[in-house]
């Protein structure tokens, strides 16, 4: 069967998918993809896989792809990060039988991508990207796609997209933020950039960014003219986003845990998903956050989920008919998380610094930060009052705390240098240079003297050759 391209690939292989779950490291595993598909997702991506590791490590291939596929999980696109055309194609050839397309990650803005020289940090190396896409387009039996971030300039972003299309990219996902927009500096994604790309290329385009609810999806499709909309963080906080529903947080948690029992994944993935899904509820029930962080088994997590459900249902029964106050709805329903801006973040950090200063000045559990109060619950015998902590005198030579029982009144490092130089002992630091030297000398004196070999007497056989000569004679 000939390889489908462009709009034919999107309409037939991807079945005209409009609702797309993004590739998310340690978060878009099989169990989560299946949950998302049950609630309106029409296309999913695997987590980003490292092409070089995928080529050399059979266990990595098995754990991250070969054992992570099933018939219900289609259509599926496998995403790789890579910076070498040959390695990218080798990895893609090993993966192409398990998916419907191969995606090249050109959008990751994280520091690990900068150190590894991949993701959004390749967006200025157009010659390299052309070679990677062209070779993959020639060698693979499935289409190659790309996920990119925009440049600040719309015209440069358009030329970038056209270059990838010309090289052989069959579908483009455009995240409407630059690589500098991340974390507290994320800001809003530019749909204007996405719209300009869509008008300039003749392949399908997916939009990514600013998607928190179904109304955002519909507005993005209308305003940009793209073929589909991809959600990442919005999907993590509400997997039913594409259905336009906001179900109770425990409902989706229970459904997800049932899928995990059938399709196991690392417990760290499960815990991370529930922290996102329950984000607003855990602000109210902090002790359940502690429990979720501590449990070591899937059944332990299920028990925390059941406890959360009971508490929320009890709260609902007490507030029968009540309406939510403020802009946020009830905490027990799935809802977006609005990331605080840089100003809000700096205020929070300033508040944390002032709290620590207050603790240092006054001490006592009544003024401890929430984090230290949690630590005190875990370590009840540990003191957090600065006034009760032991005070250490400083070493005269380096300023580090000196040993209380050091014979030289120095820290261990300085004491070791001095004791070695003077062949002295410091029992306080366990340094016994003098004692060890004395024991060594005493041992040598106690050994019998080595006997010098005596010359043979005249007329007696002298050595091996002489004795053998006599015997032969």
Swiss-Prot record:
- List compositional bias (Basic and acidic residues) regions by residue number: 341-351
Q: Which residues bind FMN?
A: 23-25, 79, 147, 175, 208-210, 232-233
- Which is an annotated Pfam family here? Dus
- The answer on whether this UniProt entry bears the keyword Lyase reads no
Q: Which SUPFAM superfamilies match?
A: FMN-linked oxidoreductases
Catalysed transformations (reactions): 5,6-dihydrouridine(16) in tRNA + NADP(+) = uridine(16) in tRNA + NADPH + H(+); 5,6-dihydrouridine(16) in tRNA + NAD(+) = uridine(16) in tRNA + NADH + H(+); 5,6-dihydrouridine(17) in tRNA + NAD(+) = uridine(17) in tRNA + NADH + H(+); 5,6-dihydrouridine(17) in tRNA + NADP(+) = uridine(17) in tRNA + NADPH + H(+)
User: What is one GO cellular-component annotation here?
Assistant: nucleus
**EC code(s) of this entry:** 1.3.1.88
Question: Could you tell me which residues belong to the region Disordered?
Answer: 339-386, 444-473
One GO biological process term = tRNA dihydrouridine synthesis
Q: Which family does it belong to?
A: Belongs to the Dus family. Dus1 subfamily.
From the Swiss-Prot or TrEMBL record, give the protein name: tRNA-dihydrouridine(16/17) synthase [NAD(P)(+)]-like
